[in-house]
Amino acid sequence: MKYNLPCVNIILRQLTLYPSILGVYNNKQIYRYCMTNKLFVTKRNGSKELIDLEKIHKVIAWAAQDLDNVSVSQVELKSHIQFYDGIKTSDIHETIIKAAADLISEETPDYQYLSARLAIFHLRKKAYGQFEPPKLYPHVVKLVEAGKYDQHLLLDYTADEFEQLESFMDHGRDLNFSYAAVKQLEGKYLVQNRVTGEIYESAQFLYILVAACLFAKYPKETRLDYVKGFYNAISTFKISLPTPIMAGVRTPTRQFSSCVLIECGDSLDSINATSSSIVKYVSQRAGIGINAGRIRALGSTIRNGEAFHTGCIPFYKHFQTAVKSCSQGGVRGGAATLFYPLWHLEVESLLVLKNNRGVEENRVRHLDYGVQFNKLMYQRLIKGQSITLFSPSDVPGLYDAFFEDQEKFEALYVQYEADDSIRKKCIKAIELFTLFAQERASTGRIYLQNVDHCNTHSPFDPTVAPIRQSNLCLEIALPTKPMEDVNDPNGEIALCTLSAFNLGAIKNLDEFDGLADLAVRALDSLLDYQDYPVPAAHTATMGRRTLGIGVINYAYYLAKNGVYYSNGSANNLTHRTFEAIQYYLLKASNQLAIERGACPKFNETRLSQGILPIDTYKKEIDNVTAEPLHLDWESLRASIKKHGVRNSTVSALMPSETSSQISNATNGIEPPRGLISIKASKDGVLKQVVPEYEKLKDNYELLWNIPSNEGYLQLVGIMQKFIDQTISANTNYDPSRFEGGKVPIKQVLKDILTAYKLGIKTMYYHNTRDGADDSLIEAEEDCAGGACKI
């Protein structure tokens, strides 16, 4: 028998490092490895040659440089057992990458970088035919000619400027990605042919060209400095960008606002305009919030009694069909959250639309729902009273007052309750709240919006620009107006453009000064750079110029600072951090207003009256943190009153399940479920290790180790003191902590009341622990999750 020498070396290295596995491999397996001289490999051009194990060894050894507790030979052995005669070179790469990724564990977390480097090597070979990336200018010329990049790049920048841009780039930063990040880049963000799988670029081209596109219209004397600064911020993960921007900026597609909020009126024309707008935006990567609260109830009269109204459910089904008609630009599946008030006459039928009981005719399961509450609803619950349900069409002025003026709403509500001529239904508040809590618990995706908090603690003046809905993921709160047709210039579709600061990459709070300036400038430029498929969206965006900048990696930030979600130790740090974030974002927008002018509808904001978030927050927060303000808010107030702000809103705290993987960060403000999460997506099963695992593993507070929602809700309330829009805040329940293994509805209601007391505007998922291994499959909801996730 003739043995292949490299193969014998592999086995010897393997046995030297791991002598205990000697008995695992029998003679037949060793023979299979050692006869690899009979294995041929099929090259990319179709020719065949003998497999070169030494070449493979060199690549894996390169990828393992400077990493701890990784074994080159273990990756080799795990790979080679899967080789076969005629295997393609690309399949060899995939096999080795998967072999390394399978070894990621709590004991050996650095395999996430070894597998990532191998994946980068493979990605570049696929894109360029070699590991070394091409020069920037010829690369851009080639892809513009192929129709993959937007031609404006060559019109806006000269060849000399491209040389300067190239000098800013550091392709070595590709090697800082984790495995989960590379797979997300391949699957979602890099420009590619989604039919053939052909990839045209690597990550640093993405980053430099996004920066170049966003600052293209800046003065030539300064724009390259901004491009360099923004490139460095995004390529070193200090600023995180959402899926639509990462996947779309630099391509001919020009719609990047993550969230779209569409309000529907109570007419067929408005319903059809809403549906048309949904289709246009879902096809361009956006997640949708639909306000359908105005639609009259089942049995209402139409055309002076000529017919009975069919009620809400047929129209909700119509919206569901529109949402699911397109995948989001080949990157995400369409998704929407639909909003209605708790006091709607059909509410008992609407609350159950998502559950698995009932029949197709009385269920609309593929939308999520946001139920709208206010102080009066909570008071009726606390006092043991009833809630009266109305059709909005029967109670003039009530629907608008629900958002604009709480005193007026209560007066009208009581007046209509006493009017026997109006159709209504009374239900005990506890029964209605219990039904809401049960459906929220059983589906996890019946959300909550406190519309009074959204309007009293808001940058907008509710008398002229009320907040009447939120978005898909419940972090956006912007004014909307119904359209009567899809080209109605008087309608208002709210768009919000997102990004986030990576708290884990921040050394001190002063850094937010420069980062906020870059983020606000880049996103503000995006508003002018993108297209608007519907006039109502262009009208609203140009008038208000709304941004939503949030955070990722909060759990790592707490772990790094030795504080926890559950015991109040993070409260003061959180207050200082979010004060700095909001202050520097407002300062940046104010500076931009000085340079370019305030947004045209600045007069519809409370900011124009000199009112800041620090003036309108819920004072209950002072009972959970006594941290004082540290920054010069009074000077900022004076400058905003004098010069305005460029952007009506600047902040929102969104989920970041996907883009946080690019930065190897924890998701948004959420605690991790495990130190290693195994996340399923259409790009495969990805292992992600929390940042600085070895050093901080004992500092992380895992989701299901947190005893209750109290501490988390306090932190969300502190954040909401400063954040001008709202927060995707979740509640989490472990049934094993409760008697009989069942979460009491009383506890769910208590948390809802606590959230209201703390001034929390919206509540997103209700998560229930299901007994599965928490580090294992954490289903990634991007396909159904919509683009307001970043």
Where are these regions (language model features)?
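Function-dense linear segments that define catalytic or interfacial modules
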Residues: 191, 198, 205, 210-223, ...
